[in-house]
Amino acid sequence: MSSAEMEQLLQAKTLAMHNNPTEMLPKVLETTASMYHNGNLSKLKLPLAKFFTQLVLDVVSMDSPIANTERPFIAAQYLPLLLAMAQSTADVLVYKNIVLIMCASYPLVLDLVAKTSNQEMFDQLCMLKKFVLSHWRTAYPLRATVDDETDVEQWLAQIDQNIGVKLATIKFISEVVLSQTKSPSGNEINSSTIPDNHPVLNKPALESEAKRLLDMLLNYLIEEQYMVSSVFIGIINSLSFVIKRRPQTTIRILSGLLRFNVDAKFPLEGKSDLNYKLSKRFVERAYKNFVQFGLKNQIITKSLSSGSGSSIYSKLTKISQTLHVIGEETKSKGILNFDPSKGNSKKTLSRQDKLKYISLWKRQLSALLSTLGVSTKTPTPVSAPATGSSTENMLDQLKILQKYTLNKASHQGNTFFNNSPKPISNTYSSVYSLMNSSNSNQDVTQLPNDILIKLSTEAILQMDSTKLITGLSIVASRYTDLMNTYINSVPSSSSSKRKSDDDDDGNDNEEVGNDGPTANSKKIKMETEPLAEEPEEPEDDDRMQKMLQEEESAQEISGDANKSTSAIKEIAPPFEPDSLTQDEKLKYLSKLTKKLFELSGRQDTTRAKSSSSSSILLDDDDSSSWLHVLIRLVTRGIEAQEASDLIREELLGFFIQDFEQRVSLIIEWLNEEWFFQTSLHQDPSNYKKWSLRVLESLGPFLENKHRRFFIRLMSELPSLQSDHLEALKPICLDPARSSLGFQTLKFLIMFRPPVQDTVRDLLHQLKQEDEGLHKQCDSLLDRLK
């Protein structure tokens, strides 16, 4: 039975590929997805997953028979199902196909989110992206994640396993970097197409994430201690695409590549000497090809924008020439021409070094998860139909609207089908309809307003100006016709209304004159008598008192009448709202925090600030005073750790967006964290955690021009430990930013004596890791003597 059903799916796929694939292939995908969720076909889970992922990959790839306008919708529709498969599968092919699908569809879905402002779609895309990136250095799905650092063999076994998935993940990382950075040309999807004030996409956060992912690839080349040749070559090849399409990354990539020492890599456990020599030769060849590619395409030039550009050019040119000579010598001698008895000159790592390597591995994984904003726990599997129901409905409506529009556009050509200057009725649809003489049955009220605005603006921008003016003229003439029709009908209706009003007034006067004992006559008499008796204008309080008395008496009269005719109605019980769940509380807390950030960012120019300093924390004249309250609240006022950490995450993201202008707030926040816990005689764990997070987040953005800012931050932190100074290590090792790191260390030596021992240890580590830093390290060590 299973083979028969799979055979039917294969036949349906073949038939759809050759006959109207635009309409047939999505139906095959829907059928496969429904079969995958069918509990009676549990034995077919793996074959269906393989078939489904391969078909989605064929649909969203560049050479797909599906139109480019349809591919983003199809990719977005099945994001929840792909995430569920990735979390539950143990098959390498299925997981690899999912990663390749992300490579092809991530730019498309990101562009769709930018155009539709769909928060739910973006959340699903981020969940799948985070899951894939969190497993890129593991052997998932072949092995479960290893938590015990002392299990050396289990950790090291993951290094060269599942290479195909790792290479696919590297390709996906490069696609994320390309999609989330600016492009000099407008022919591809990039962050330049995202508005600065987009309601869903945070443009600075996306660009920051792209920089960190690029640094992650470069750091792998530098810090990986084993010769994983396939991964090294994959990263170098991916960097060639990034540096070609994003010239602004040239300095960053070339600086990292200069620190990539092929000779310093150790052979993998259990691999032969010949395997190590071949692996090393392949990596050197890829390195040389990268440099030659950069020179040939005028990427690596003497006129690079950095001051150290000429040195980078000369160093890379020399490395390329040296590698070429080594390759020629190896070719002439023969790579197999060596004495196996002498063994490999490279020694293996000791157990202690292996434990350090695994510890570094775990720290890098934690930093990656922190960058992506996820916890170290595995995400809970999601149910595809429940999560994507609203998204699928909206996508279906957009597809119907798109099909209807394309059909009308193909028939009408350059003229409007309905160009009558008079509308059929006084409805908006008849005024604006230029494609039908009757209702089009397109209910766009089901779509969100932001999507409607985006569709309208895109249509106006792409329309010919002459045709747009013609259409607007037709609509204007219809409005004019409706207005003239209304004006002509107003006089007769208003005169008849006046006549009826006069008749009503006469009847009312008769009732008052007859003194009839009705409720209306009593009420009118009560309202008119005070006006006749008052010789002068009473005070406001007296007038209000009289009005209240009159209202009470009127209510008593009407109440007595109602009691005689009907029973007293029972009072409805008070409304008791449902209590919020924990997730809802955190959601509203996050929204409230963002509103405070918007308020603090708003510049108040209506009132000038007073020159005298005020001791009030919440000052109406200071738009940023809410931040001081928020800092005090998060450090002292919220007992729930989860809620306070959520606000801290928002604070960190807000400060990093403009860290130069907000350095005072950063220092205030961290000092409050330290002071509150130390005043209670507690270990300042919150201060340590979030001060390290601040330094890790600032690392990718710091440049030499930020010297004053960074020295001030480091000098005003209330407590500095070895972990804080460890954040200076990558800055000191970076050739483009080393002066920033050493100037900061010099300042700490001079003005913060308690950290001198820690600085001394850091300088010794820098001397061991980079011989080119000996001179700078020795000059600072001399100050410590």
UniProtKB/Swiss-Prot annotation:
Q: What does this protein do?
A: Essential in pre-tRNA processing. Component of the cleavage and polyadenylation factor (CPF) complex, which plays a key role in polyadenylation-dependent pre-mRNA 3'-end formation and cooperates with cleavage factors including the CFIA complex and NAB4/CFIB. Component of the APT complex, which may be involved in polyadenylation-independent transcript 3'-end formation.
Q: Does the keyword Nucleus apply?
A: yes
The compartments listed are: Nucleus
Q: Which gene encodes it?
A: PTA1
Q: Which residues carry this modification: Phosphoserine?
A: 500
Protein name as annotated: Pre-tRNA-processing protein PTA1
- InterPro entries (alphabetical): ARM-like, Symplekin/Pta1, Symplekin/Pta1_N
Keyword set for this entry?
mRNA processing, Nucleus, Phosphoprotein, tRNA processing
Primary location: nucleus
Looking up Pfam families in the UniProt record yields: SYMPK_PTA1_N (PF11935)
Taxonomic lineage of the native organism: Eukaryota, Fungi, Dikarya, Ascomycota, Saccharomycotina
